[in-house]
Amino acid sequence: MTPTLYYCYDAYCGWCYGFSPVIRRVFKEYRDRLAFEVLSGGMILPEKPQPIGVVAPYIQKAYKTVEGHTGIKFGKDWLWHIFNPEESDWYPSSEKPAIALCVFKEYHPELAIPFAADVQYALHEEGRDLTDDEAYRHLLEKYGIADKEFYEKLHSPVYKAKAYEEFALVKQLGITGFPTLLLQVSESRAYLLSRGYTDYETLRSALERALEAAGQEAS
C-alpha cells in the first residue's frame, strides 16, 4: 500500500494555523510518494453555543506564543474579535468547518491538505466566521466547486455524520492535542511522527526514519 500521512487538526487550533506552512511544504514535497488524509478533531463542540469571550482572555496571551514559536502572524481582523469579544458576534464551533472538509473531500480528496490550510487562513488571517456559510464561498471558486451543490451537502445530515465519525476516530486513536501526524505504512502498522507543533526539518527527519523503518520491515 502507499503510505498514508494522517494530519489530525482542528480549524480553530492556533497551533495548527502556525503549522500550516509546514504541512503545506510536506504535502508539496511528498505528494508523489505518500497519500494524504486530513481528520478534523472536534476541538470546540459545546453543548450550548459559547461566545468568543469565553476563550478570548486565554487567546489574547497564547497567540503571541504561537507567533513566537512558528513565525506565523495572526491577522488584524481575527485579532479584533479576540480583543473586542464583547462586540463580537462569534460563537466558535468546530462542527461546520469539519463538515465543510468532509464535503470538500467528495470533490478533491487529494487536495484536503491545502483546503484545510486555506480554511485556517480564512479564520486566523482574514477573520471569517467559520460558523457562517459565506466563510467558504471564496474557496468554492478557487477549487471549482458549484455553490448550490456544496451548500446543500454542507447542511446534509449525511456529511454531518461523516464529520462526527472523524471526531470519533481521532478520539479512538488517542489523540488529544493538535496538530498530530501519523504515518500508516500497512494495515497493522503506523508511526506517530509528531504531536504538537513541529518544524519542517524535524518532521522531515521523523518521516524519513519512519519510511526507512517501514521499508526494512517489508523486506
Roles of regions detected by a PLM:
Residues 1-6:
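Extreme N-terminal starter segment of soluble prokaryotic enzymes
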Residues 7-8, 12, 19-28, 118-219:
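C-terminal cap of thioredoxin/glutaredoxin-like
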Residues 20-123:
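Structural alpha/beta surface segment adjacent to cysteine/selenocysteine redox centers
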